[in-house]
Amino acid sequence: MPDPTCDDVARRMREGGVAPLVAAGWASWKAGRWREGTGGADGVLFDLASVTKPVLAVGVARSGLSRTDKLGQHVKEARGTPTGGLPLELLLAHRAGLEAHVKLYEPLLVGGAIDRGEAFERAARARRVDAGEPTDSGFAPIYSDLGYLLAGEALARFEGATDPDEVLAARVIAPLGLEGQLGSARQLEARGLDLRTIAAPTEDVPWRGGVIVGRVHDENAWAMAPTGAPGHAGLFGEVSAVLRFGEAVLDAVKGRPSPLSGDLTWLVRERPGGTLRAGFDGKRAPGEGPTSAGTVLGARAFGHLGFTGTSLWIDPDAEIVVSMLTNRVHPSRENVAIREARPWAHDALALRASK
């Protein structure tokens, strides 16, 4: 439903130079049903960047893949590496001792090609030099794209799929009825959508041919699956679709009927050592520094941000969901105005949802 608060948030973001395109939305559970409001560029498909990670985690939870399975059971390139013997849950919870990022796409910069097997092995060997020794709950939490790249590949191979987005389409997107509103580039284009006209443009990258439109912005995701979603990034979505995903996650966590039925509680539970959970992040406690979630969402809120300027937050106590999607990297990632804008924007959406 069109909502003035969402339109106002989008307008302020645009006029403040945060991003050329902004879509905002909120949802609240009241009187046994979900109420929603959206505004701004609703209907535009945004590159969700790392907001793909919660979808991947839910896909793992809803598959037959066990979170206690070792990575090397499913990804042969990981066998004999420091990561191969770790359970998938630690990869999803950013507690596998992996580097945050490795430039797996580097061969493309010099006209080479990507050897996917070599890339997966390289990712699995990327143990941080300061990782230390693991405890029963894994290594100290360090945010890592690589863990999701590897967990996504484990999911794909377990399900007999080419890439994780095929599994997510069946396990998450189809049950939500969001085909055409949420998916990888190839899935959306297979439904006849022209992403060149309905996807928000992202960065102007000369080595990739200029302004990126309808293809994932993340370099590693593009290198590993040019039109797919390897696990850490690659999905596109409308703000209404991201809200619907958040609603279904909260319904499942609360034990209500949900298209995403199954045990998702292990994904969102708090873990020792930091705010990072499996597929989601949590709010920093007062005194631990600023939080992009703002001040209105409760202390137990969980969600995720995306590098392209996207976000999803879920408050399980107030039973509200907020999302903001932007293309803040257009035309350049150097625009970081969103860092100051996110808290007040999330506050405005959460206040509206609370009414």
Give the location of each predicted region.
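Hydrophobic (often cysteine-bearing) scaffold residues that line and stabilize catalytic clefts
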Residues: 2-5, 48, 52, 56, ...
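Short, glycine/proline-biased beta-turn/loop segments that scaffold the active-site neighborhood
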Residues: 67-82, 175-176
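Structured C-terminal helix/loop/strand segments within mature extracytoplasmic catalytic/sensor domains
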Residues: 303-355
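Short, surface-exposed loop or secondary-structure junction motifs
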Residues: 19-21, 29, 33-34, 81-300
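Residue-level preference for non-acidic, small/hydrophobic
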Residues: 9-10, 24, 53-60, 91, ...
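Alpha-helical scaffolds flanking conserved acidic
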Residues: 45, 70, 85-89
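Short, positively charged
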Residues: 1-8, 288-295, 348-355
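A short, well-structured edge-of-sheet supersecondary motif
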Residues: 7-48, 58-59, 67, 107-110, ...
